[in-house]
């Protein structure tokens, strides 16, 4: 099923938000997993099948119980529960500081329909439910990540010009589901995945114990801890060795105690992994993220930049995965609305921070030696994701997890050579120096 974004307005879910809810039906497993969304400017291209397309793609993820099941499809959400090694904080800005507008979601059904018409798929939550609670943070976050997914996919498809994003919609029997969009074997991108997950249920005992170990002594009701988790996660691997890989992830989590007390927090980040160092690109990427952070306080970028450098560290290699960006977790201050506005601002910075860099380098000439070095660096990327990334490890060791979406972050190709070491003063050695000793790119 090939769709243009502009044609989504004729679908049944579009009619539903205008009041005809009886016509709203969940897509069949086959049609959902086979969907290919063609974006403006890509007419006439051949549809390509993405990851997660198979017998288990559309019929539910068959997940286990608790949080492990809930994470099905976005490993980054596991880090939101199990990876709180630090607590992110934002201090309220002075009254003289510029404050972004709240961006309140309009309750009018036509406005919601107009906004949803640009998405890659209908939202995971029923539109009637979203319309009933426009001011709820779960609604705001779900619509924001759906919007971000569409914006990123549209921008990447326009850059590639050949390949389409497959749209793989999956459901979770315990509650919620997700939308995995993958473009692979394109002209510019070897593999680009943009995944959304919106899940809810009860925390597993393991997850509850992890929270208690971090000082969150949550009280169960009848042995259960209800939770909601949602987020967007993306990894983009271009073909050209001079175009860097980029990753971003933004998520929201709620847990309700027995007495009705609600705990909530945000997490996420955005980072760049170049094969070869281009200082102009590094400055552009970090400056764009800094400008986004600075809208919410002058001390945020330095703190989250260091956190990123520390987190994406391959200890057995003594290297960072890339040149960093920002990373934060357990963000629950100064208020839910301000924290959301910060996350939204960061999500809006994804396209302007990265797409100009890809456009600049996607047609650069390169040698077989350049490609070889790219494959070796991709090997490092795989090592970090499989050995250190908390969300990936948790998902892989959890029975019933949706493996296709968890491994979406891995490149199509990578390489390992025994005792490989680049020559001194080479451009390969230059990037290694930066990976071993992180730099300040904006001062």
UniProtKB/Swiss-Prot annotation:
Subcellular location per the Swiss-Prot or TrEMBL entry: Mitochondrion intermembrane space
Disordered: annotated segments: 90-111
First-level EC class: oxidoreductase
EC number(s) stated in the UniProt entry for this protein: 1.3.3.3
Residues annotated with N6-succinyllysine modification: 393
Pathway the protein acts in: Porphyrin-containing compound metabolism; protoporphyrin-IX biosynthesis; protoporphyrinogen-IX from coproporphyrinogen-III (O2 route): step 1/1
UniProt keyword terms in alphabetical order: Acetylation, Heme biosynthesis, Mitochondrion, Oxidoreductase, Phosphoprotein, Porphyrin biosynthesis, Transit peptide
Catalytic activity of the protein: coproporphyrinogen III + O2 + 2 H(+) = protoporphyrinogen IX + 2 CO2 + 2 H2O
Pfam families: Coprogen_oxidas
Region (Important for dimerization): 182-191, 381-417
Residues recorded with modification Phosphoserine: 101
Residue positions of the active site: 247 (proton donor)
UniProt xrefs under NCBIfam families: PRK05330.1
Stated role: Involved in the heme biosynthesis. Catalyzes the aerobic oxidative decarboxylation of propionate groups of rings A and B of coproporphyrinogen-III to yield the vinyl groups in protoporphyrinogen-IX.
Protein family per UniProt: Belongs to the aerobic coproporphyrinogen-III oxidase family.
Subunit structure: Homodimer.
PANTHER family the UniProt entry points to: COPROPORPHYRINOGEN III OXIDASE, MITOCHONDRIAL, OXYGEN-DEPENDENT COPROPORPHYRINOGEN-III OXIDASE, MITOCHONDRIAL
Record protein name field: Oxygen-dependent coproporphyrinogen-III oxidase, mitochondrial
Organism of derivation: Rattus norvegicus
């Amino acid at each position: 099923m090939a769709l243009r974004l502009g044609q989504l307005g004729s679908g049944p879910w579009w009619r539903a938000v205008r009041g005809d809810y009886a016509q709203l039906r969940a897509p069949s497993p086959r049609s959902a997993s086979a969907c290919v969304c063609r974006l403006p400017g890509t007419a006439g291209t051949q549809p390509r099948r993405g990851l997660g397309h198979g017998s288990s793609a559309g019929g539910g993820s068959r997940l286990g119980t608790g949080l492990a099941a809930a994470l099905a499809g976005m490993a980054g959400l596991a880090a939101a529960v199990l990876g709180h090694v630090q607590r992110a904080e934002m201090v309220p800005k002075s009254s003289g500081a510029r404050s972004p507008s709240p961006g309140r979601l309009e309750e009018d059904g036509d406005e919601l329909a107009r906004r949803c018409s640009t998405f890659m798929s209908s939202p995971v939550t029923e539109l009637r439910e979203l319309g009933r609670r426009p001011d709820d943070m779960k609604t705001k976050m779900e619509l924001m990540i759906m919007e971000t997914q569409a914006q990123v996919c549209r921008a990447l498809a326009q850059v590639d010009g050949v390949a389409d994003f497959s749209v793989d919609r999956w459901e979770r029997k315990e509650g919620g589901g997700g939308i995995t969009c993958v473009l692979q074997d394109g002209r510019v991108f070897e593999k680009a995945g943009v995944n959304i997950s919106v899940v809810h249920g009860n925390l597993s005992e393991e997850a509850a114990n992890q929270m208690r170990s971090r000082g969150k002594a949550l009280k169960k009701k009848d042995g259960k801890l209800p939770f909601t988790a949602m987020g967007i996660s993306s990894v983009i691997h271009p073909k050209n060795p001079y175009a860097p890989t980029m990753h971003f992830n933004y998520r929201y989590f709620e847990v309700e105690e027995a007495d009705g007390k609600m705990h909530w927090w945000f997490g996420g980040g955005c980072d760049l992994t170049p094969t070869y160092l281009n200082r102009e690109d590094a400055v552009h990427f970090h400056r764009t993220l800094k400008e986004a952070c600075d809208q919410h306080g002058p001390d945020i970028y330095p703190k989250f930049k260091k956190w990123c450098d520390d987190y994406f560290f391959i200890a057995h290699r003594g290297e960072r995965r890339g040149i960093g960006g920002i990373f934060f977790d357990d963000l629950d201050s100064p208020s839910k609305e301000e924290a959301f506005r910060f996350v939204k601002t960061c999500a809006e910075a994804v396209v302007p921070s990265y797409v100009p860099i890809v456009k600049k380098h996607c047609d650069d000439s390169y040698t077989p030696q350049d490609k070889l070095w790219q494959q070796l660096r991709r090997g490092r990327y795989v090592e970090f994701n499989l050995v250190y990334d908390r969300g990936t490890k948790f998902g892989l060791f959890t029975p019933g997890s949706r493996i296709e979406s968890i491994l979406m972050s891995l490149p199509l190709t990578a390489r390992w050579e025994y005792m490989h070491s680049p020559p001194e003063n080479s451009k390969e050695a230059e990037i290694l120096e930066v990976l071993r000793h992180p730099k300040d790119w904006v001062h």
